[in-house]
Amino acid sequence: MRKHTLSVIVITKNEEDRIETCLKSVVDIANELIVLDSGSTDATVEICQKYTDNVTITDWPGFGKQKQRALDKATCDWVLSIDADEALDKEMSDALVELLKQDQIKHTAYKLPWGVTLYGTTLKHGRSARAVLRLFKREGSRYTLDEVHETVVPEQGSTGVLKGFLLHYTHRDYGHGLDKAAQYAWLGSQKYHRKGKKSHGLFLALLRAIWTFFLVYIIRRGFMDGSVGFIMAMTYAQVNFNKYVGLWILENRSDDRSNDQAK
């Protein structure tokens, strides 16, 4: 018998090809399943309504604000935040059920090891060799309001790691991967610019890209994931390069405007 209740929160837009896998992996675990959709034009909403009545259509304020909206709707003891292109594997699902049965849960938050599934391969190294904080006590937790790469700030306490994998079906195909990488790079450029971060020039952008490839492919052993591991290391290097190039362009555009105003 479970001693703790669980809210699962998901944000969606045009995810009809992936959302059902996500919802199937959590529907039997969740005490409440909360979906916020930001204007899907495909069958995403209809699919979600097969699994929960708690589906809300909203505008799109950015990732952080949308996740916070979903969190504000949660009422259970614990919250699992899962993306539409993710799903719990069986080991993680079972581990979560066992956790909620405990009288006293040791930690206030848990990281979930990522298993990026790409081009038919589930990667276990490289960028996937990390765990993301997605399970946390609801009381006292909040999201940062960043437009991209938002993070949850849980109630003060220790953080554990849940067994199993959070499967991440990150790219529909290579073209989708390129589009997604470009979007995240540009959003990252704008985020850094708003926060006053400096690019320190294009040569440093190149060095950052080289370091990213070395980190993902060598230090985190992306080479052990074969050809797909190489593709992923190159993709992340390109994203980091584009992010700082975008920041450099924004800096120079701001400088040009300041000079024009001073004339």
What residues fall within each predicted segment?
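Short beta-strand/loop segment that forms part of the nucleotide-sugar
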Residues: V10, A30-G39, T56, A84
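Catalytic-site signature of metal-activated, phosphate-bearing donor transferases
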Residues: K65-L71, W78, I82, D89-R253, ...
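Conserved acidic residues
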Residues: N31, D53, D77, D85, ...
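Short, structured coil segments at secondary-structure junctions
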Residues: I29, K50-T52, A131, E155
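A conserved acidic beta->alpha catalytic loop
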Residues: S25, D37-E46, D83
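Conserved donor nucleotide-binding strand/loop of the catalytic core
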Residues: N31, V45-K73
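N-proximal low-complexity "stem/linker" segments adjacent to membrane-targeting elements
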Residues: M1-S25, D256-R257
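Acidic helix N-cap motif at the loop->helix transition within catalytic regions
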Residues: D17-E20, D42-Y51, E91-M92
